């Protein structure tokens, strides 16, 4: 009787796949940030980035990749809701938001 379990295709070892996943995550975070500034206030993007690091990484002790993944999910959801409500941005950038005092938080990747 033959083994019914699926076999790993050649060239797809765990190490290669994991490395590609991290590259994909970093690249996707940068790309979504470049797109998000055309639809969301920069201040909002920066605050979500900062708060994601404070909560998921610092408070919960999660890895950098998990923190970036959670941030990515939040920004994707924000863009989805924005577009669902009827985006009329047409590529114009929004201002800083103007609703927070003090120095701005450090920018997320792709917006530095």
From Swiss-Prot:
Disordered: annotated span? 93-112
Q: Name one GO biological process term.
A: symbiont-mediated suppression of host innate immune response
Coiled-coil regions, chain positions = none
For bias type Pro residues, the affected ranges are: 102-112
Tell me the InterPro entries matching this sequence. Lentiviral_Vpx_assoc_factor, RetroV_VpR/X
Q: Which Gene3D superfamilies match?
A: 1.20.5.4730
Which top-rank group of organisms is this from? Viruses
UniProt keywords, alphabetically: Host nucleus, Host-virus interaction, Inhibition of host innate immune response by virus, Viral immunoevasion, Virion
Cite the record's note on assembly. Interacts with the P6 region of unprocessed GAG. Interacts with host VPRBP/DCAF1, leading to change substrate specificity of the CUL4A-DDB1 E3 ligase complex.
Q: Which family does it belong to?
A: Belongs to the lentivirus VPX protein family.
Q: What is this protein called?
A: Protein Vpx
Name its species. Answer: Simian immunodeficiency virus (isolate F236/smH4) (SIV-sm)
């Amino acid at each position: 009787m033959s083994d019914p379990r699926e076999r790993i295709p050649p060239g797809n070892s765990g190490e290669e796949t994991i490395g590609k996943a991290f590259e994909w995550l970093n690249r996707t975070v940068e790309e979504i940030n470049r797109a998000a500034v055309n639809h969301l206030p920069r201040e909002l993007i920066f605050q979500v980035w900062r708060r994601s690091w404070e909560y998921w990484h610092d408070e919960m002790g999660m890895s950098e990749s998990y923190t970036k993944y959670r941030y990515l999910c939040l920004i994707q959801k924000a863009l989805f809701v924005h577009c669902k409500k009827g985006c009329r941005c047409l590529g114009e950038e929004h201002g800083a938001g103007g609703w927070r005092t003090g120095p701005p938080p450090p920018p997320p990747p792709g917006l530095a």
